[in-house]
């Protein structure tokens, strides 16, 4: 019986000692810090779940907005390609002209003797030049007939050709059979866009008995409002051409100018004093006396 009482009192004492002791004798039974960490991890896992759902919604909306942009880009490309290619169809030939910085067009024009014809074009251009190509025997020859800019207008009279030009057209009046041929216009914009157009003019007799009043050729001479140096040089050249001075007189004047220049150079050299070619040594040379001693 005594040993039963001893065991009972021992258990009671151990129980009271455990109640007053706040330490954890065994790490496997201690749950104070573990409980706190578990609650924290549960809170974190709950916060992660809504975040993942929000990201998936943003991804879905971005994909939906990207699809229309791709369709719009495809429309722009197709529109640019269709506006870039210009097709010209003739009776026996089809050619495609692409609007690059240099484009060439060809037109067939028919005119009647004694009447007039207009070779016109559209668009805003900065520099216009008209050329006339010769007869079939002169395929590679061209003659400038007109140059027009915003502040400059000049025509080159060509035989019996009656014409006038401006920034949008070339007017040929009082047509004759000799006016048949090719007329080429070269035009340039401010952005260096270059374009050529060839007009093949065929002049024939009209099927009419009416009398056509011939117009007098009122060709415009040089009308220049620009005062730059290169335009002044053009005036000088045109004046010399109109003077029609023989070549012998030009040679005589050139010889006189060269002779005067040579005489001026010779007289200028004679006025300058000549420098001596050597320097005289003194009679007494100290170096020579030193060597003798």
From Swiss-Prot:
The entry's keywords: Membrane, Signal, Transmembrane, Transmembrane helix, Viral envelope protein, Virion
Main location: virion
Record's GO cellular component terms: membrane; viral envelope; virion membrane
Membrane-protein topology: Single-pass type I membrane protein
Keyword Plastid applies: no
Cellular compartment(s): Virion membrane
Signal peptide: 1-19
Transmembrane segments: 245-265
Keyword GTP-binding: no
Known role: May play a role in modifying tropism or in modulating cell signaling during virus entry. Since RL13 expression severely impairs HCMV replication in epithelial cell cultures, it may act as a regulator promoting persistence by suppressing the switch to fully lytic infection.
Protein name per Swiss-Prot or TrEMBL: Membrane protein RL13
Origin species: Human cytomegalovirus (strain Merlin) (HHV-5)
């Amino acid at each position: 019986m005594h040993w039963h009482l001893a065991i009972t009192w021992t258990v009671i004492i151990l129980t009271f000692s455990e109640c007053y002791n706040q330490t954890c004798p065994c790490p496997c039974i201690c749950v104070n810090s573990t409980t706190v960490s578990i609650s924290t991890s549960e809170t974190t896992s709950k916060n992660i779940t809504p975040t993942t759902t929000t990201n998936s919604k943003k991804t879905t909306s971005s994909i939906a907005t990207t699809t229309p942009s791709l369709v719009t880009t495809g429309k722009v490309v197709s529109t640019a390609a269709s506006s870039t290619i210009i097709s010209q169809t003739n009776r026996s030939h089809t050619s495609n002209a692409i609007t690059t910085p240099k484009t060439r067009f060809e037109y067939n024009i028919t005119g009647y003797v004694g009447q007039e014809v207009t070779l016109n074009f559209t668009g805003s251009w900065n520099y216009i030049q008209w050329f006339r190509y010769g007869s079939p025997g002169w395929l590679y020859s061209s003659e400038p007939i007109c140059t027009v800019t915003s502040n400059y207008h000049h025509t080159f009279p060509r035989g019996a050709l009656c014409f006038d030009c401006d920034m949008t057209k070339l007017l040929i009046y009082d047509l004759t059979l000799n006016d048949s041929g090719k007329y080429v216009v070269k035009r340039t914009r401010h952005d260096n866009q270059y374009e050529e157009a060839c007009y093949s003019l065929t002049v024939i007799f009209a099927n009419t008995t009416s009398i056509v009043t011939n117009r007098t050729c009122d060709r415009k001479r040089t009308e220049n409002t620009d005062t730059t140096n290169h335009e002044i040089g053009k005036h000088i050249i045109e004046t010399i051409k109109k003077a029609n001075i023989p070549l012998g007189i030009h040679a005589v004047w050139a010889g006189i100018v060269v002779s005067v220049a040579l005489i001026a150079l010779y007289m200028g050299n004679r006025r300058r004093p000549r420098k001596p070619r050597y320097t005289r040594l003194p009679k007494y040379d100290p170096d020579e006396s030193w060597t003798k001693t």
